Regions:
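Acidic (Asp/Glu)-rich catalytic clusters
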Residues: 63-69, 112-124, 174-178, 232-235, ...
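Boundary/entry segment of secreted carbohydrate-active catalytic domains
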Residues: 37-92, 389
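Substrate-binding cleft of extracellular glycoside hydrolase catalytic domains
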Residues: 82-237
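Ser/Thr-rich, Pro/Gly/Ala-heavy low-complexity intrinsically disordered linkers and tails
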Residues: 1-39
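Aromatic- and acid-rich polysaccharide-binding/catalytic face
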Residues: 68-81, 262-306
Length: 425
């Protein structure tokens, strides 16, 4: 369900400076609440990022990362873990070539170089790591392992997998150290937790293999609590959040659906898993361009940019507003598709309307239909307690910042030049 941009991201990291990454200031504190930027939800997080306006992020090549004054850049850490119990001390035949820690040498340099590259950008960018390791580690360890609830009921109960998993998480956090970074823990996993049952009763290996979390319950809830607590211990200036999957709402066309109730249920689950002590919660609109889904998979995933019919952006923002207010943490859009009306609906050039809905512009309504001009919706995002939007391709053949005709870069430059939209209005 996820695209792991291992090769592309690794090459980008190799182009970054090798100087040490630095930190700026203190961690925002639990819950992402109010700060000097105002009394609105999320202002403390933006304070920590050095801004008061909604941020724009990107994932892509080193060229894309510097094509506009982006506020943050993100990258996946994925592909599976080292085969030994603890992180490799040297990269070679004895260490899995798919482990992120050996995309550069010595082990861990990949993350350091990524942070350094973000810090040396002009203007300076905040690095964001999407930690997505359970699925591919389980696939490499358990014969026939399939994505889904087995990640919860099988992988998270496997002592061997979880020993390596926590050791790798600790290694990443120690690599970040005092630096400022955003940490996004396991997209999709928490959605599968919801499908599997109650996280406070679903078993997971926690303290039995992790000395940092001996006081945590041996449940999925304890696993999430443990990972966030480890951030506070080893990377105190990092900001962290789980992901909220709006799978019941993303394609909803029934106006009678209680969107707020669904969001509240997700919030309750995530809070039990430690989100109540996190800084932000991650949300997404889709993992692929709508044009791709329509042409290649014969699926209609278009959202109405006029918000007149369902599914719509307004419906999603209603869900996010209820989610953030129930959690007490702001949201961050992540991995937002880059397709636009000028694309030709072939590989790497699929249409979508996400960029143009958020920034304003000529937005595609369907794959073959005429585009409609819409105004920007940054104020609507602020009203839903959204910190900003990070754009990036969700698969190798999707529209990305290098193939979108410069649409994202041009709109980001105009947005940043205008001073952006204040979160606290």
């Amino acid at each position: 369900m996820r695209f792991c941009a291992i090769v592309i991201a690794a090459l980008a990291a190799c182009n970054h400076s090798a100087s040490d990454a630095t930190s700026d200031g203190a961690r925002s504190g639990d819950g992402g609440g109010s700060g000097s930027a105002g009394s609105c939800l999320g202002s403390t997080v933006l304070d920590a990022l050095g801004t008061s306006h909604l941020v724009v992020g990107v994932s892509g090549s080193s060229t894309a990362e510097t094509s506009a004054p982006f506020d943050l850049r993100y990258v996946y850490l994925s592909g599976g873990l080292f085969t030994s119990t603890t992180p490799c001390t040297a990269c070679g035949a004895s260490c899995s070539s798919s482990w992120w820690g050996c995309y550069n040498t010595p082990p861990g340099a990949y993350a350091t170089l990524f942070m350094t590259g973000a810090g040396s950008a002009s203007p300076k960018q905040t690095p964001m790591f999407t930690y997505y390791e359970i699925l591919q580690t389980a696939q490499a360890t358990i014969s026939g392992f399939q994505e889904g609830t087995a990640e919860v009921t099988q992988a998270a109960t496997d002592s061997g997998i979880m020993t390596r998993y926590y050791n790798d998480w600790r290694f990443l956090l120690q690599t970040i150290g005092q630096s400022r970074a955003l940490l996004h823990i396991e997209p999709d996993f928490w959605g599968y937790v919801r499908q599997a049952g109650d996280p406070t009763t679903l078993a997971a290996v926690v303290g039995a293999v992790n000395p940092d979390c001996t006081a945590m319950p041996s449940t999925i809830a304890g696993m999430g609590q443990c990972m966030i607590a480890m951030v506070r211990k080893y990377a105190p200036n990092a900001l962290v959040g789980l992901q909220a999957s709006a799978w019941n709402i993303a394609g909803n066309t029934d106006a009678s659906t209680d969107v707020t109730q669904d969001a509240t249920q997700v919030a309750t689950l995530l809070a039990a898993c430690g989100q109540s002590k996190a800084d932000f919660v991650v949300v997404e609109t889709s993992d692929r361009d709508a044009g791709y889904y329509q042409l290649v998979e014969d699926r209609d995933t278009w959202w109405d940019p006029t918000d007149m019919t369902l599914p719509s952006y307004a419906q999603d923002l209603t869900w996010i507003k209820a989610l953030t207010e129930a959690l007490g943490t702001p949201a961050m859009f992540w991995q937002t598709p880059l397709g636009n009306a000028a694309q030709t609906n072939v590989a790497n050039h699929y249409k979508d309307n996400r960029v143009d809905y958020f920034f304003g512009g000529s937005a595609s309504q369907v794959e073959s239909g005429a585009a409609v001009t819409v105004s920007d919706h940054w104020s609507a995002l602020a009203a839903a307690h959204v910190l900003g939007v990070a754009f990036g391709a969700g698969a190798g053949d999707q529209t990305d910042p290098d193939t979108d005709g410069g649409n994202l870069a041009t709109k980001t430059q105009a947005y940043e030049s205008s001073g952006g939209t204040q979160l606290c209005q």
